């Protein structure tokens, strides 16, 4: 009996110690998962305000099945946390970048300008007249150069849509299903009510009596609704470059992947590895993703799920960008 009692006592002590040990480890896990990041930070290099976007899972793609085929199928995506610029990169920020960085590393070995030409400031001023307006006429290469200099990067397409949705499910736009020109700078100052699309009356209300000029707007020009993360102009104003290579079938590939069978695909990115892309982006020749619509876009192109693309050399008066950076413990 004494032997049995001793075995029982020692066994009970071991069980108690095991429970305490596990509890301490669980406590550590909870503590790590409860790490609080600053919701808004000022990025030192370029002075941009950035919002903390808490990672999580969402369904990516066209919920309403009213867009293009490349917006389907919907698929579950899990993203790690990141910071995103509240506003698009401005003319002033880009000018500062050029003043600090423009040197031989932006030219070919023979000294001739190639994929990194100097901006035509007169053209830019016609559509973005002040340093507070979004930078335009920037190629994907230009945006990548800026992001690298600033210690940031372009968002993946999945990060962009996740941020634009702002935690909302199944909406056409970051704020809801209805759009008019008090909510976004789109349609070239005319809105989208004259569209031949069958659902145009449902999507767009009448433009205001005093339509804005057909050009970009700076922060504060439009008393728009912002998405729940506090980001601005995620719909319209300027289309925004993403890091991804364009792949019209990427959503289907994600849906068919082994990862999705486990519940969701983690941090999807079309074009290899992000680290490799950041190091070798000047060798890229394939089309890149554009998101968000622009000041002269029809409201169909302003939808959260709308996908677009262009060659990395492409520049336009309606194309700009914003940056992200990873959030690590």
Regions found by a protein language model. Name each.
Residues 66-77, 169, 234-329:
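Surface-exposed recognition segments
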Residues 2-9:
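Bacterial N-terminal signal peptides that target proteins for export
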Residues 74, 120-132, 191, 303-308:
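Short glycine/proline-rich turn/loop motifs
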Residues 24-33:
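Bacterial Sec signal peptide processing site at the extreme N-terminus
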Residues 20-21:
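C-terminal motif of bacterial Sec signal peptides marking the signal peptidase cleavage site
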Residues 60-66, 78-183, 244-248, 325-329:
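Active-site microenvironments of metalloenzymes and redox enzymes
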Residues 131, 185-235, 251:
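Short, well-ordered junction/capping motifs at the entry into regular secondary structure
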Residues 36-52:
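GGW-centered surface loops in extracellular recognition modules
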């Amino acid at each position: 009996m004494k032997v049995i009692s001793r075995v029982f006592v020692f066994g009970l002590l071991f069980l108690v110690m095991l429970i305490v040990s596990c509890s301490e480890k669980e406590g550590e896990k909870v503590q790590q998962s409860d790490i609080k990041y600053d919701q808004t930070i000022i990025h030192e290099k370029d002075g941009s305000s950035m919002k903390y976007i808490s990672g999580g899972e969402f369904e990516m793609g066209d919920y309403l099945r009213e867009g293009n085929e490349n917006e389907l199928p919907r698929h579950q995506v899990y993203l790690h946390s990141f910071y995103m610029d509240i506003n698009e990169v401005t003319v002033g920020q880009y000018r500062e970048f050029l003043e600090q960085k423009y040197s031989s590393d932006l030219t070919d070995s023979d000294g001739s300008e190639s994929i990194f030409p100097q901006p035509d400031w007169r053209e830019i001023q016609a559509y973005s007249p002040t340093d507070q307006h979004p930078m335009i006429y920037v190629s994907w290469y230009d945006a990548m150069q800026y992001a690298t200099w600033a210690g940031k990067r372009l968002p993946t397409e999945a990060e962009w849509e996740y941020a634009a949705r702002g935690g909302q499910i199944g909406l056409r736009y970051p704020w809801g299903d209805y759009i008019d020109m008090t909510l976004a700078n789109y349609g070239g100052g005319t809105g989208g009510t004259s569209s031949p699309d069958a659902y145009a009356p449902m999507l767009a209300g009448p433009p205001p009596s005093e339509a804005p000029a057909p050009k970009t707007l700076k922060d504060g020009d439009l008393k728009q609704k912002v998405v729940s993360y506090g980001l601005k102009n995620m719909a319209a104003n300027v289309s925004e470059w993403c890091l991804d290579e364009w792949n019209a079938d990427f959503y289907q590939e994600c849906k068919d992947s082994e990862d999705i069978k486990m519940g969701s695909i983690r941090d999807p990115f079309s074009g290899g590895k992000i680290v490799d892309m950041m190091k070798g982006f000047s060798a890229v020749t394939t089309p890149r993703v554009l998101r968000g619509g622009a000041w002269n876009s029809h409201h169909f192109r302003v939808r959260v799920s709308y996908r677009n693309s262009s060659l990395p050399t492409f520049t336009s008066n309606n194309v700009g960008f914003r940056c992200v950076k990873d959030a690590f413990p």
